[in-house]
Amino acid sequence: MEIAACHRLQLSYDSPCGGLHGHNWIITVYCKAKKLNADGMVCDFKHIKNAIHGKLDHSNLNEVLGFNPTAENIARWVVQRIPQCYKCKVQESEGNVAIYTSHNNAQADEL
């Protein structure tokens, strides 16, 4: 899914990313289940989109997330937010991609 959002990064070094700037993020969510539900799905994509797109699209990520919104942290947040999600890929621009994978979503690291 595509998200239009702005952020500024809090980094330990000088970077232009410390200033407010925006991206058209592409977020890919990977879900799994031992068995499909009664509808033949792992989960409804609409529920995933509502949980992510509904919260992040056209927002200031620093304000809505409450943590340093690096692509890596956003990917981890998605994995923690969607119970069936085990991996998330966040692309903030072409060539700038972060992937977070949890081998056991229930025990994903806390932010």
Residue ranges and their predicted role:
Residues 1-111:
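Charge-rich, low-complexity N-terminal segments
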